[in-house]
Amino acid sequence: AGINCLNESHFSDTTPCLAWMMLYEEGRLIWGCEADTLSMATQFILHRALNTPIMMTNLYPSLMSGPALKHERIPHFPDVSAYADPNPDNYVLVAHCGYFGLLPPSFGATWTMRPKVLAIVDENAHAIDARFPTGPVTLAKLHPSMTKLTAVEGTLEGYAQYPGSDCLNGGVVHVPDGHRLVRGATSHHYLITTGHNLNDMQMAMKVFGVGVEEM
């Protein structure tokens, strides 16, 4: 199930986040934010094939930090100097609708419902503040041509908070080559799974005759 929950938010006095999470927990119904059918198709296929926690979020590579600063209303990109790779080029801020992303309680290391963050939605709306456990993750999305899946394994190093912004709790993901990710990514909307799942994704996509391109 999916609706254009942001751009058509004026039709409702709330957001569908909690309803979608309840529907997933009750019947494993896959949800789609912002009417992104390609993300929803990717999420459906990978979740059914791999049976791993997965959600859609926004990617903000450090190499393109300008849009992140503007879109999320944050003053600077997260400080990564304390991580194993101190090169900021190889990091991505991941955030969606004020927090890390929309995931059900069974996927989260922590999970809390919060008041809305974005100005575009009704004052009665809500958002989900949840986290994956830190550690290995995989970013993936079907290419618009539907002929290949773009994917990369990385590490969720931690979280960054920016009070008063549109990113109250975002994830900080390390990837092997930030330049390669920027060249290969097809959208700012991407799926993120727990664990390193590239090999399993290659096997699953082979069933559908779909290739896998590593970013």
Outline where the language-model segments fall.
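Anaerobic metallocofactor- and corrinoid-dependent redox/one-carbon enzyme cores
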Residues: G2-M215
